[in-house]
Amino acid sequence: MVKIRLRRAGRKKMPVYQIVAADARAPRDGKFLEVIGRYQPTAKPHSITIDKERVEYWLGVGAQPTTTAQSLLRATGLLYEMNLKRKGRSEEEIVSEMAQWQERQSARLQKRLAVKARRRQAKKDAQAAAAASAE
């Protein structure tokens, strides 16, 4: 059975992962069939590059993505695009659906960043209030 999974590379405390198609029996960093992408979790923001054609090929021949690889494929929108193709949508519909999906993802990211900024500000305010009351 072929799996789409992550293969660790990089140096100590600075991981870079290759997204590979590999035999399920092979070790994590061992023999693989093909490199189909790259994931850099330490980059700000995280960097994911995937060869869509090769991922579609491997999924088409029955490769199973691991949960982590599947979440990365979902984050890039590849699984959503493949699902639209499978449903028989036209190319124009797929392009418009993917544009809407990109907008939803960017809105979700902006909302998450706003929440994070509010929490950070609330924490600073609480620390300032605690310091003022301590004096």
Swiss-Prot record:
One Pfam family here: Ribosomal_S16
One BP annotation, GO: translation
InterPro entries: Ribosomal_bS16, Ribosomal_bS16_dom_sf
Protein name: Small ribosomal subunit protein bS16
Similarity comment text for this entry: Belongs to the bacterial ribosomal protein bS16 family.
GO MF terms held by the record: structural constituent of ribosome
Key words, A-Z: Ribonucleoprotein, Ribosomal protein
Gene assigned in the entry: rpsP
Xref: NCBIfam families: S16
Matching PANTHER family: 30S RIBOSOMAL PROTEIN S16, SMALL RIBOSOMAL SUBUNIT PROTEIN BS16M
Gene3D superfamilies tied to this protein: 3.30.1320.10
Gene Ontology CC entries for this record: cytoplasm; small ribosomal subunit
